[in-house]
């Protein structure tokens, strides 16, 4: 049985750990709320630019952008968004499991995959795919730099435009609420047209400041970039939510462990006192009988 001193040391250690996990939980809550606000404010931009693309495309039916072109799949691109830090439960491992299953399915069909990796946690997992990794983007922080994101995916988009890649997916953790985050893989390219009653079937005539093709190309590129950026924000919000829950669980476990150690401390202390009293009584009896 552990001594009283050892138990007191354990209690102190667990109490200090509890303080750390509680602080990390509060920090994660604050960061999650801020990221959630940025994520919510970015959604209307993606929706509006998608509607603009559809309106403009209807005005130029003779021009079919490569982002709308469906091709026979010979090679795919996969953008994987993970976190830079750990202590967020099974968030990353669940995503990687889904991605690896996706890659395995394409590999069985003899379709190679080119990868773009976001986040430090993805690097060791896909180390064996080093020859297929086009770029690695890490340390994005709480406020991802849009230029850093664009530069990271640019090589993949160029390969798609010259038909060296036929389909592009992005894998990330979708944020639902602080309790629920789900790994998700969606198709980025080719784009599918919006089927909505809000989009009129009427053909529109537009006046352009410069060549219409350049404007349409720019709109398509901006839309894909906004989708990737939005996915990164979703993943960051999911990371903070998962870390908040992990730290909350750790704090609760620490509280339970402290209760157990205090109970053990009292038992050991009581046993020690009882033993000392027994020894004193035995000594006194020996003296009186001697």
From Swiss-Prot:
Membrane-spanning residues: none
Principal location: membrane
One GO term (biological process): proton motive force-driven plasma membrane ATP synthesis
InterPro entries: ATP_synth_F1_ATPase_gsu, ATP_synth_F1_gsu, ATP_synth_F1_gsu_CS
GO molecular function: ATP binding; proton-transporting ATP synthase activity, rotational mechanism
Family label: Belongs to the ATPase gamma chain family.
Subunit structure: F-type ATPases have 2 components, CF(1) - the catalytic core - and CF(0) - the membrane proton channel. CF(1) has five subunits: alpha(3), beta(3), gamma(1), delta(1), epsilon(1). CF(0) has three main subunits: a, b and c.
NCBIfam families linked to this entry: ATPsyn_F1gamma, PRK05621.1-1
Protein name listed in UniProt: ATP synthase gamma chain
Organism field: Buchnera aphidicola subsp. Diuraphis noxia
Encoding gene, per UniProt annotation: atpG
